[in-house]
C-alpha cells in the first residue's frame, strides 16, 4: 500500500494528489478491478491471448506504415 507523508505547510489537496499518483504508479486500482470478480483460468488465458494478438497486429501495422513513408 503506497504511503505519503504530509510535509509541513503542505495543503491537503497536494498530499492527496501525490497519494493518488503513487497509487496509480503502483497499480493499486487496476489490481483491485482485476480481482473484483473471479476469472476462470481458461477465461484469463483467452483474454491474454486476445491481447497478445491485438498487440501483434498493432505492432505489425506500425511497421508497415513506417516502411511506406519513404519520401
Swiss-Prot record:
Q: Which GO terms describe its cellular component?
A: ribonucleoprotein complex; ribosome
Q: Does the keyword Ribonucleoprotein apply?
A: yes
Gene Ontology MF terms:
structural constituent of ribosome
Matching Gene3D superfamilies, A to Z? Ribosomal protein S8
Enumerate the residue ranges of region (Disordered).
39-71
Signal peptide range in chain numbering? none
- Which segments show compositional bias classed as Basic and acidic residues? 60-71
Q: Which UniProt keywords apply?
A: Ribonucleoprotein, Ribosomal protein
Q: Which domain of life is it from?
A: Bacteria
Instruction: Tell me which InterPro entries the record gives.
Output: Ribosomal_bS21, Ribosomal_bS21_CS, Ribosomal_bS21_sf
Q: Which GO terms describe its biological process?
A: translation
Q: Where is the composition biased (Basic residues)?
A: 45-59
Q: What Pfam families does its record include?
A: Ribosomal_S21 (PF01165)
Q: Which family does it belong to?
A: Belongs to the bacterial ribosomal protein bS21 family.
Q: State the name under which the record lists this protein.
A: Small ribosomal subunit protein bS21
Gene name as annotated? rpsU
